[in-house]
From Swiss-Prot:
Function: Involved in the efflux of purine ribonucleosides, such as inosine and guanosine.
Protein name according to UniProt: Purine ribonucleoside efflux pump NepI
Top-level taxon of origin: Bacteria
Gene giving rise to this polypeptide: nepI
Keywords in alphabetical order: Antiport, Cell inner membrane, Cell membrane, Membrane, Transmembrane, Transmembrane helix, Transport
CDD domains for this protein: MFS_NepI_like
Length: 397
């Protein structure tokens, strides 16, 4: 029955893709991600200017992630039938306001308030991203549109820290956030001009968010999402000590490795739509299986710099399929409740990132250098098995 509802929901979709709106959404996402990670490269001048320690200043990143998790969970309950066009415009305005509040912050409290505004926009936008995408393009084009959005994310992740560091040294950290506010204004203008009216959820489709987990294969899917992202952060959070101590990379070498990873991630995201068109389930099971094998290879032969560098590239290519693949799964199998499913997905990912990094750090401190790799590889292997055995993918109509 649920599959029939999803089929009807997709049948009512758009006939032609609205690429201007898709790129507007992608630009907003890229700006949100860039601003989220700007403090990483500006912590020292921010801390000095505000008279706080770098550790305290780092909480400006933590509070954004914390607020984003709750925003993603409850945004669809709050906005209900409100036109999603106005909600996206509001998120773009919040992005701009956040940048200005941080730029003019004269206290740690105002800094946190500005970053909390960013968290509201970030979590809400991510929760709605899959449902927005499937309402802007025909069903057959959804994987391609999602790859555009996640491609923008990859670019933002690659350029955010180095761009912030470079500009901060020239114009100062406050003007970096002023420049980000200008990007926020551009987001508002682009969204206003390109995004069509997107009515909220009709009353007959209202359903408790967590009742979605009772649908066949959905709980398994969320568990697989948790394990794949926890596995990613269990390893990637500690890539610096692993690569510098295991493979013997210096700082410059590690920078090149991370740049290669970022480029590979962008390439993988760009081509993900072609893989997902052929088989979503194969991508969702095959990518973590390849990552599990990569972790094993790094454990056995990671002392070789060539092998370690190659694994970073393979990792970037393979993991790029994971976020696009799971968003595609939502648009296929939970099309009638895509917003609520997206809310749960984002909250699960935020929790997985936190747990993966925490457990990976504990393993590194107590069980040695290879333990985050072993943990990551084990989680990725379990993900592949759960997807293959339990996750259901609704065929594209």
């Amino acid at each position: 029955m649920n599959e029939n509802i999803a089929e009807k929901f997709r049948a009512d979709g758009v006939a032609r893709p609205n690429w201007s709106a898709v790129f507007a959404v992608a630009f907003c996402v890229a700006c949100l991600i860039t601003v989220e990670f700007l403090p990483v490269s500006l912590l020292t001048p921010m801390a000095q200017d505000l008279g706080i320690s770098e550790g305290v200043a780092g909480q400006s990143v933590t509070v954004t992630a914390f607020v984003a998790m709750f925003s993603s969970l409850f945004i669809t309950q709050i906005i209900q039938a409100t036109d999603r066009r106005y909600i996206v415009i509001l998120f773009a305005v919040l992005l701009t306001a956040s940048c200005l509040m941080v730029s003019f912050a004269n206290s740690f409290t105002l800094l946190l308030l500005g970053r909390a505004c960013l968290g509201l926009a970030l979590g809400g936008f991510w929760a709605m991203s899959a449902s927005l995408t499937m309402r802007l393009v025909p069903a057959r084009t959804v994987p391609k549109a999602l790859s555009v959005i996640f491609g923008a994310v990859s670019i933002a992740l690659v350029i955010a820290a180095p761009l912030g560091s470079f500009l901060g040294g020239i114009i100062g950290w406050r003007n970096v956030f002023n420049a980000a506010a200008v990007m926020g204004v551009l987001c508002v203008i682009w969204v206003v001009k390109s995004l069509p009216s997107l009515p909220g959820e009709p009353s007959h489709q209202k359903q408790n968010m967590f009742s979605l987990l009772q649908r066949p294969g959905v709980m398994a899917g969320m568990i697989a999402i948790f394990m794949s992202f926890a596995g990613q952060f269990a390893f990637f959070t500690y890539i610096r000590p692993v690569y510098m101590n295991l493979a013997g990379f210096d700082v410059d070498g590690l920078t090149l490795v991370l740049l290669s990873f970022g480029i590979a991630s962008f390439v993988g995201t760009s081509f993900s739509s072609y893989v997902l068109k052929r088989s979503v389930k194969l991508a969702l099971a095959g990518a973590p299986l390849l990552l599990a094998l990569s972790a094993l290879t790094l454990i056995v032969w990671g002392s070789d710099k060539t092998v370690a560098a190659a694994i970073a590239i393979i990792w970037g290519l393979a993991f790029a399929l994971v976020p696009v693949g799971w968003s595609t799964w939502i648009t296929r199998s939970l099309a009638d409740q895509a917003e609520k499913a997206g809310s749960i997905q984002v909250a699960v990912i935020q929790l997985a990132n936190t747990c993966g990094a925490a457990v990976g750090g504990y393993a590194l401190d107590n069980f040695g250098l290879l333990s985050p790799l072993a943990l990551s590889g084990g989680l990725m292997l379990l993900t592949a098995l759960v997807v293959a055995a339990k996750v259901r993918i609704t065929p594209m109509s």
